[in-house]
């Protein structure tokens, strides 16, 4: 009976050690994957097209503003035959950002008042 009990304890210890090793390997793999995604995102973020610059080469490359991504808007200038595309912020998103800014400032004032 002692042998079975010791063998059982040995198996449980071995199983817990091996599962801990697998979890560590899994965590390391997940961490490496996350770091590679972050690096790709940083590289992609550097390639964005600023507001009011030409975005005809890639219409999805516009930079983000504080809350929303700018939109590539194309138009024909008066008297011209060539299409011009620039990154712009739609007016409704501009107003939403202003409202969010004012709400943040107002929230800060309320926080000051009530501590």
Swiss-Prot record:
Subcellular location: Secreted
Xref: Pfam families: Toxin_35 (PF10530)
Residue pairs linked by disulfide bridges in the UniProt entry: 48-63, 55-72, 62-87, 74-85
Span of the signal peptide: 1-20
This protein's GO CC annotations: extracellular region
Keyword Mitochondrion: no
InterPro entries cross-referenced by the UniProt entry: Spider_toxin_CSTX_knottin, Spider_toxin_CSTX_Knottin_CS
Transmembrane segments: none
Tissue localization of expression: Expressed by the venom gland.
Gene Ontology MF, one: toxin activity
Major place of residence: secreted
Propeptide position ranges: 21-44
Keywords linked to the UniProt accession: Disulfide bond, Knottin, Secreted, Signal, Toxin
Domain description: The presence of a 'disulfide through disulfide knot' structurally defines this protein as a knottin.
Record-stated family: Belongs to the neurotoxin 19 (CSTX) family. 01 subfamily.
Protein name as catalogued: U3-lycotoxin-Ls1a
